[in-house]
Design a protein with these regions (language model features):
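Proteins enriched for Cys/Gly/acidic motifs involved in redox and nucleic-acid/cofactor modification
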Residues: 1-238, 277, 292, 314-322, ...
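Detector for intrinsically disordered, low-structure N-terminal pre-sequences
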Residues: 72, 156, 245, 337, ...
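Proline-centered flexible-loop/turn and helix-kink motifs
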Residues: 101-104, 129-130, 260, 286, ...
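Conserved SAM/AdoMet-binding glycine-rich loop
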Residues: 108-110, 117-119, 222-348
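Structured C-terminal cores of nucleic-acid metabolism proteins
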Residues: 344-364, 368, 387
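Low-acidity, Ser/Thr- and Arg-rich intrinsically disordered low-complexity segments
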Residues: 367-371, 375-382, 386
C-alpha cells in the first residue's frame, strides 16, 4: 500500500484559530456563557484527541459541563475497537433526542474512530437526524471550520477523509489534569493485525518530529506536570517514517535530559519491534518508569500467525527475559484475546501456560469483538475457549 506523509501547514492551523475567534463572537452573541460537553470513549489516544477538541472549544469561548441538557455543543469522541463501545455510543446518541427537543439550537457532533467508518457515518446520517456534525480522526484539526459550517450554513456536515492521515502541530489543548499528561508522539498503525480496525480508521504510522515532542515535553514540565505518558499505537515504530535518524530509544533519552522532577511512561509497545536498545535506554534513564505494556494476545504460534502478530511465543518470552535482565524490577502488563476464531482448547492452554511462565505479569483479558473492517471480522467463532 502506497503512503505519502502529509504535514498540515502552520498557516492552516492559524486559520482554524482565526475561525475560533469568529465562533467566540457567534456563541457569545446571546450574552451568556456558552457551554460544551465532550464525552470520550476508548483509548488514551482518544483522551488526548479530546484535549485538543476542548482546546479548540476553549478558544471559542466555551466553558465545560457534564450536563447534556445545559450544553450548547455536545461532542462524542468515539471508539471502534470493540463492539460494546459502538453500542454504547448509539444508545447515548439516541438519548440526546430529549435534549435536542428541549433545545433545538443544540449542536451534536460525533467524531473519532467509530465515525471514520463509512457504514457508521451512513447510519448516523439516516437514522440519527439529531446529529449535526460527523468527522473522523483525520479531520480533527479542521473542527472549528466544520463547526462553523454547521452554525452559519444551518446544515448537517459529514467529513470523512479516506486518506491515511496527517500530522498537525499547534492545536491548542485543554488538559484534563495538572499532574499527569498525555503526549502523542505518533499516530496510526502499520501492523494490520487481523482482529484490529485501527489502521483502517487511524491511518498509517506518522511520527511527530522529535523537536516538536521535546518542546511539548518541556512545556509540560514547566507547567508542573509530573507524569508524562508518551502515546502511540506502536511506540517502538517511532521515527521510521521520518528523514531523521531517530528511534524511540533516542526520543526517551532526549526527554529524559529535560531538567526537572518528572516521570516518563509510554504505551504501547509491540513484541516484534521492542529492542535491546530500548530496554537499555529505559534502564539508564532515571526518569523512565520501569513499566511496559507488551501485549502478547495469545501464547500459541498458530493463533499468533492467524492474528498477523509477527512474532512467536518463543520470541515474546525472549523479549520479556531480555527486558528483565536490564530491569529486574520491571512491571509488565499485557493483553490477551480469548476466543479468537478457530482457537482450540489446546491452543488456549498454550496461552494459560505462557501466563504461568511469565511471573508477575498483569493481564487484561477480553472476548473478541467482530469488526466489519478487520480481516478476521467475517470469521465466526465456533469454538470459544473459557477461563
Amino acid at each position: 500500500m502506497s503512503y505519502q506523509r502529509v504535514e498540515i501547514p502552520e498557516s492552516d492551523i492559524q486559520r482554524q484559530l482565526d475561525i475560533c475567534a469568529q465562533l467566540r463572537a457567534h456563541f457569545s452573541a446571546g450574552g451568556r456563557q456558552p457551554l460544551a460537553m465532550v464525552d470520550t470513549y476508548g483509548c488514551q489516544q482518544n483522551e488526548a484527541d479530546s484535549e485538543k477538541l476542548r482546546g479548540y472549544l476553549r478558544a471559542m469561548g466555551f466553558d465545560f459541563t457534564q450536563d447534556e441538557f445545559a450544553a450548547d455543543v455536545v461532542v462524542m469522541n468515539t471508539c471502534a475497537v470493540r463492539e460494546h463501545a459502538e453500542t454504547r455510543v448509539f444508545g447515548n446518541v439516541g438519548a440526546l433526542t430529549h435534549t435536542k427537543a428541549r433545545n433545538p439550537e443544540q449542536i451534536i457532533a460525533v467524531c473519532g474512530c467509530m465515525a471514520q467508518q463509512e457504514h457508521v457515518a451512513e447510519k448516523l446520517k439516516k437514522s440519527y437526524r439529531i446529529v449535526d456534525l460527523v468527522f473522523g480522526p483525520h479531520e480533527l484539526w479542521r473542527f472549528p471550520e466544520l463547526l462553523r459550517s454547521v452554525c452559519t450554513e444551518h446544515r448537517r456536515v459529514f467529513a470523512i477523509d479516506p486518506a491515511d492521515g496527517s500530522v498537525a502541530e499547534g492545536i491548542p489543548q485543554q488538559r484534563d489534569g495538572s499532574v499527569k499528561a498525555w503526549l502523542s508522539i505518533m499516530y496510526g498503525c502499520n501492523n494490520f493485525c487481523t482482529y484490529c480496525i485501527v489502521p483502517y480508521v487511524r491511518g498509517r504510522e506518522r511520527s511527530r518530529h522529535p523537536e516538536e515532542i521535546v518542546r511539548e515535553a518541556r512545556e509540560l514540565v514547566a507547567a508542573g506536570y509530573k507524569d508524562i505518558t508518551l502515546l502511540g499505537q506502536n511506540v517502538d515504530s517511532y521515527g521510521r517514517d521520518l528523514d531523521e535518524d531517530v528511534d524511540f530509544a533516542d526520543l526517551i533519552r532526549s526527554i529524559n535530559a529535560i531538567p526537572g522532577d518528572f516521570v516518563i511512561r509510554f504505551m504501547s509497545s509491540h513484541p516484534k519491534d521492542a529492542t535491546e536498545k530500548l530496554f537499555r535506554a529505559m534502564a539508564e534513564c532515571e526518569k523512565c518508569a520501569h513499566q511496559m505494556h507488551l501485549p502478547v494476545q495469545s501464547g500459541n504460534d498458530r493463533v499468533l500467525h492467524a492474528m498477523n502478530r509477527g512474532y512467536t511465543r518463543e520470541k515474546y518470552l525472549a523479549q520479556v527475559a531480555l527486558a528483565r535482565q536490564y530491569m529486574p524490577d520491571l512491571v509488565l502488563t499485557t493483553d490477551i484475546i480469548v476466543g479468537f476464531p478457530g482457537e482450540t482448547d489446546a491452543e488456549f492452554q498454550d496461552t494459560l501456560s505462557l501466563v504461568v511462565t511469565v511471573p508477575g505479569v498483569m493481564m487484561r483479558m477480553m472476548s473478541r469483538s467482530t469488526s466489519p473492517l478487520a480481516s478476521a471480522g467475517s470469521s465466526s467463532c465456533s469454538q470459544m475457549a473459557t477461563l
